[in-house]
């Protein structure tokens, strides 16, 4: 076999055994562990196939019909499919599907609608917001006068009166509604009224709840915001990437220029193909049933944890995630994250509102239902997972360094559970 022939035919296992080995171990991890990280999901075989397609080879700077490279006929076809599907999915007039991530989508809005030094009002990272909403370490916190709103100390719900007061005091150019760790619905109408009262643009970052919105189970922010951003993974169950929506033609033109050439060069056409597939999947009745199951499973998990004496921030959830306050159990986020992983359950440590622990330690964990629901888990399985989590909690209280016997017993039960619901 010639070198050229082998280049196109030699499988990964032969060409690079080290990478193949790591991928095989990662597949085994995903198959045998329960994934409760709220921002993660499991994509379909079709999405994987599209992302691993020959579009990996294609440069396509520009937009459909207006490329800076030749040979883009089929790239145009794929991107146009993605655009039309996401517009239909969220009833939006305009869409840009090229952002490589949610952070890039948010950055493109800031580039399009603000200038360095402007005031931006977003949710504090400490209260459940996202880095890109004005956190000090992020570009949005360095290039802008970032003012942050939070939650009520008693209810742990967004303090809309505070949002309004801060908006009137600081006169932001942009108000951001969205979160990375907030378990309740957002009042988009209230946010828009506040934005209008000070002449600000409203951006909704729906990354975490895009799938819930697509299924019609939460209100659609496109009806309220000047511009909406999102990731394509999480509850939308697509590849890792981003997109931007708006109903305003002038804003759409600015967004397109901000994405390319403002922030990015060539789009990742293989990822856009996978986005198109995921958008198509999200338009089905099966997807709506899936989201209903996600919401039911998250509630069931929360109920079991509360029955076991665990505090939930806001007392429960309206969406796919739970924010668990570990302080009543005398535990730390890092400690619990590590113990649960040893027991076959992956989650992430997470700060809670008014947390006094360092971000590397935290007083909480974040749990989510999307990935385990994708593999077929229902309410019964999530209640079982909740009971197993409580076992690990109690073992940690008795032995803060970890209880190997309990963790191994739980891991065996988790493995048996996963074996009943195989993936790939």
UniProtKB/Swiss-Prot annotation:
* Taxonomic lineage from the root: Bacteria, Pseudomonadati, Pseudomonadota, Betaproteobacteria, Burkholderiales
**EC class (word):** transferase
Superkingdom: Bacteria
Naming one, the record's GO cellular component terms include:
cytosol
Q: Main localization of the protein?
A: cytoplasm
Protein's name in the database: Serine hydroxymethyltransferase 2
Sorted alphabetically, which keywords does the UniProt record give?
Amino-acid biosynthesis, Cytoplasm, One-carbon metabolism, Pyridoxal phosphate, Transferase
The chain residues annotated with the modification N6-(pyridoxal phosphate)lysine are 234
What are the names of the required cofactors? pyridoxal 5'-phosphate
Q: Which family does it belong to?
A: Belongs to the SHMT family.
**EC number of the protein:** 2.1.2.1
- Gene Ontology MF terms: glycine hydroxymethyltransferase activity; pyridoxal phosphate binding
Q: Which CDD domains match?
A: SHMT (cd00378)
Q: Which organism is it from?
A: Cupriavidus pinatubonensis (strain JMP 134 / LMG 1197)
* Involved pathway(s): One-carbon metabolism; tetrahydrofolate interconversion; Amino-acid biosynthesis; glycine biosynthesis; glycine from L-serine: step 1/1
Tell me which residues are marked as the site Plays an important role in substrate specificity: 233
Location in the cell: Cytoplasm
């Amino acid at each position: 076999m010639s070198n050229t022939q082998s280049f196109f035919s030699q499988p990964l296992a032969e060409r690079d055994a080290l990478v193949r080995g790591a991928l095989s171990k990662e597949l085994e991890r995903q198959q045998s562990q329960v994934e409760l990280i709220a921002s993660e999901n499991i994509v379909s075989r079709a999405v994987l196939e599209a992302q691993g397609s020959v579009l990996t080879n294609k440069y396509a700077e520009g937009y459909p019909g207006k490329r800076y490279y030749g040979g883009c006929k089929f790239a145009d076809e794929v991107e146009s499919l993605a655009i039309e599907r996401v517009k239909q999915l969220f009833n939006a007039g305009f869409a840009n599907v090229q952002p490589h991530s949610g952070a890039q989508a948010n950055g493109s809005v800031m580039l399009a609608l603000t200038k360095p030094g402007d005031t931006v009002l977003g949710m504090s990272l400490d209260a459940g917001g996202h880095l890109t909403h004005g956190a000090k370490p992020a570009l949005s916190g360095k290039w802008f006068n970032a003012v942050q709103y939070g939650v009520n100390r008693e209810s742990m719900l967004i303090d809309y009166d505070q949002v309004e007061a801060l908006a009137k005091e600081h006169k932001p150019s942009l108000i951001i509604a969205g979160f990375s760790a907030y378990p309740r619905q957002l009042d988009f109408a209230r946010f828009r009224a506040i934005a209008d009262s000070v002449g600000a643009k409203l951006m909704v970052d729906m990354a975490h709840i895009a799938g819930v919105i697509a299924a019609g189970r939460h209100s659609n922010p496109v009806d309220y915001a000047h511009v909406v951003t999102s990731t394509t993974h999480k509850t939308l169950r697509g590849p890792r990437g981003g997109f931007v929506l708006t109903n305003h033609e002038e804003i759409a033109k600015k967004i397109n220029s901000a994405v390319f050439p403002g922030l990015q060069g060539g789009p990742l056409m293989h990822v856009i193909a996978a986005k198109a597939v995921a958008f198509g999947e999200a338009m089905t009745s099966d997807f709506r049933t899936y989201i209903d199951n996600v919401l039911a499973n998250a509630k069931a998990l929360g109920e079991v944890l509360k029955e076991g004496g665990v505090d939930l921030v806001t007392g429960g959830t309206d969406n796919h995630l739970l924010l668990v306050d570990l302080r009543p159990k005398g535990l730390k986020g890092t400690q619990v994250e590590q113990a649960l992983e040893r027991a076959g359950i992956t989650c992430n440590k997470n700060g809670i509102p008014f947390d006094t622990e360092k971000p590397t330690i935290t007083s909480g964990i974040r749990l989510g239902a999307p990935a385990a629901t994708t593999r077929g888990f229902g309410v019964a399985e999530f209640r079982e997972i909740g009971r197993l989590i409580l076992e690990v909690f109690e073992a940690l209280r008795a032995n803060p360094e970890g209880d190997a016997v309990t963790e191994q017993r739980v891991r065996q039960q988790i493995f048996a559970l996963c074996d009943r619901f195989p993936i790939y």
